Regions:
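Ligand-binding loop in jelly-roll beta-barrel domains
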Residues: 1, 102-128
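A generic fold-level signal
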Residues: 31, 44-48, 68, 92, ...
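Short, conserved beta-strand element in jelly-roll/cupin
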Residues: 53-57, 66-85, 121
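Conserved short histidine dyad/triad with adjacent acidic residue
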Residues: 33-40, 52-68, 89, 101-104
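Residue-level detector of conserved, well-ordered beta-strand and adjacent loop positions
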Residues: 40, 57, 77, 93, ...
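Short acidic-glycine-tyrosine-enriched beta hairpin
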Residues: 73, 86-102
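A short, N-terminal "cap"/entry segment at the start of jelly-roll beta-barrel domains
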Residues: 1-49, 130
Length: 130
């Protein structure tokens, strides 16, 4: 992840030390079979990026195909899933790493018998400089 921090006025980010096992999952996008853990506050504009764990129960999926202006990557923590990158579906599993280019259409769903979970980084709270 290579990006210089982009300040927001006088707000300053601060150090957060947490164990991912101590962070509670919350329901993602009103779906009862997809859950998210946020490592940084999602409501504090001092932070220009975040780290999350997204976990899909078997059959759980993104609610739509999405794209992002930023590049980002993900590391698969558990299970297996199918992931759409551009126009290709590919199987991914625990210990795989995936890098997404900007504007690459993407979505996922969990397959198998255990949750499909991955950790990922993502820019947030800043407009893209054009």
């Amino acid at each position: 992840y290579k990006q210089k921090y982009i300040p927001y006025g006088e707000k300053k980010p601060y150090v957060i030390l947490e164990d991912s096992n101590q962070i509670e999952y919350r329901i993602y996008d009103d779906m009862e079979n997809v859950f998210i853990k946020d490592f940084l506050p999602t409501d504090d504009l001092a932070f220009d990026m975040n780290m999350h764990i997204l976990s899909f129960e078997p059959g759980g999926c993104h609610p739509f195909v999405e794209t992002h202006v930023q590049e980002h990557g993900m590391y698969i923590l558990t299970g297996e899933g199918m992931y759409l990158l551009d126009d290709t579906w590919m199987g991914i599993k625990k210990d795989d790493f995936v890098w997404f280019g900007a504007y690459c259409p993407q979505c996922a769903y969990g397959v198998g018998r255990e949750p499909f979970a991955y950790i990922y980084s993502k820019d947030c709270n800043r407009d893209v400089t054009i």
